[in-house]
A protein has these predicted regions:
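A conserved mid-protein helix/loop that constitutes part of the nucleotide-sugar donor-binding site
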Residues: 14-25, 211-234, 251-257
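Aromatic "clamp/platform" in nucleotide-sugar-dependent glycosyltransferases that forms part
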Residues: 102, 274, 293
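A short, active-site helix/loop in glycosyltransferases that binds the activated sugar's phosphate group
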Residues: 151-180, 185-187, 321
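Nucleotide-activated donor-binding/catalytic signature segment of Leloir-type glycosyltransferases, i.e.
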Residues: 257-273
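Conserved acidic donor-binding segment of nucleotide-sugar-dependent glycosyltransferases
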Residues: 324-336, 343-346
Length: 392
């Protein structure tokens, strides 16, 4: 198949865009021709470079929803943009178009473009939380606009886990086709893990006895880096050999540095900034502490599981993922219980092993690419059948 993957252009470093990279790789390995349509904004340059070796990159003049002051209210009326984009997509003659959106209101003009060009399409939405849930400005109006545009979309709307798909169905009251396809990450070579772990820990100046707790993600409110900091302070009191390392950058970086200094955690808590390759850090760590406020199915978490790292999350988050349980995940809600498990190597090895098996069985790039491949075939067949009926 000739597959056109479309980014709404929110950036190169978020999980949603890394998902697009993994999917493109997986589809290429399955011998499909992958085209990747990326907005020409400089923030997309990094993703374009990383994907150029396995996909044909197309840069286009397109403005992301969050580059408009009025957000989705602005994209609600930009029919000219949608028609221009539709014409460009149609000229590429893809068999199927796959639009990748961060949230409900992001890229609604791209869904309109898909309707206009008539090519079979699907759309992945990573976060299906409403603007009202997020307490955004003009939330009611923005939710109404998103509901209206999503309900008019004739393709399949894909959520990345069942809980998010259920919310999407309820929001649209059954007026759109919805489906769950789980995110996937590449397989990690277990043999390479041990050699790279030793080298990375030496580079970071870590002692063999240090227990390294990682945070992974952008330094933004959604990821709750200051909750990570509070957890670090509490865990350090009870586990003095613990060291805490945040891997990522963002708008809260300066505030984070001041908070570390204010809490006198220099030498205990540090930040590695943005890293193009997080795998060596995952190898060097002993635990991933994931405390984000809201998520879809975070790639950081399943990348850590694939690398054999035990992971700790909130019970609220784990309740949305039915295959997360006490065998393959730890919980941050009870600090004393977490401290006891941190001190038990047998428990950590068991949880890490179960997490790694979970990724291999359910959350691999291979499984994700195969599931999307089948969905593409289904929407192409459905479109062909509809054309036959209308012409008959």
């Amino acid at each position: 198949m000739k597959i056109l993957l479309v980014s709404s252009g929110s950036g190169s470093r978020g999980g949603g865009e890394i998902f697009l990279k993994y999917l493109a790789e997986g589809l290429t390995e399955r011998r499909h021709q992958v085209l990747m349509w990326l907005p020409s904004h400089p923030r997309m340059d990094e993703l374009a470079v990383r994907c150029a070796r396995f996909a044909h990159i197309i840069r286009a003049d397109y403005r992301n929803t969050y580059d408009y002051w009025a957000r989705s209210v602005s994209t609600c009326f930009n029919w000219g943009v949608s028609h221009r984009v539709a014409g460009a997509w149609k000229a590429l003659r893809p068999d199927v178009i796959h639009i990748n959106k961060q949230n409900l209101e992001d890229g609604l003009d791209l869904l309109r473009a898909a309707r206009c060009c008539g090519v079979p399409s699907v759309c992945t939405i990573h976060l299906t939380h409403t603007a009202s849930y997020l307490r955004a400005k003009a939330a009611w109006l923005r939710d109404q606009i998103a509901r209206w545009q999503l309900s008019r979309y004739s393709g399949v709307l894909v959520a990345v886990q069942d809980g998010r798909c259920r919310v999407l169905r309820e929001l649209l009251a059954g007026r759109a086709y919805t489906k769950t396809i789980l995110n996937g990450v590449p397989r990690v070579d277990a043999v390479a893990l041990h050699a790279l772990r030793k080298a990375k820990r030496k580079e970071l100046g870590l002692a063999d006895s240090d227990f390294v707790v990682l945070g992974l993600g952008r330094l933004v409110e959604q990821k709750q880096p200051f909750l990570f900091l509070r957890m670090a302070k509490e865990l350090y009191k009870q586990c003095p050999r613990a060291k805490f390392l945040w891997v990522g950058d963002g708008v809260l970086a300066k505030q984070w540095e001041r908070a570390v200094a204010r809490e006198k955690l220099d030498g205990v808590v540090s930040c590695a900034g943005w890293q193009g390759d997080v795998l060596p850090f995952l190898f060097a760590g002993d635990l991933l502490l994931h405390v984000a406020k809201f998520e879809g199915l975070p790639l950081a978490l399943i990348e850590a599981m694939a690398a054999g790292l035990p992971c700790a999350v909130t019970r609220d988050f784990s309740s949305e993922i039915p295959f997360f349980n006490e065998e393959n995940i730890l919980f941050v809600d009870d600090v004393q219980d977490l401290v006891e498990k941190i001190g038990n190597p047998l428990v950590l090895r068991s949880v890490a092993g179960a997490g790694r098996r979970l990724v291999e069985e359910k959350l691999s790039v291979h499984n994700m690419a195969r599931s999307y491949e089948q969905l593409y075939l289904d929407v192409i067949e459905s479109a062909t059948r509809s054309m036959s009926l209308s012409s008959g």
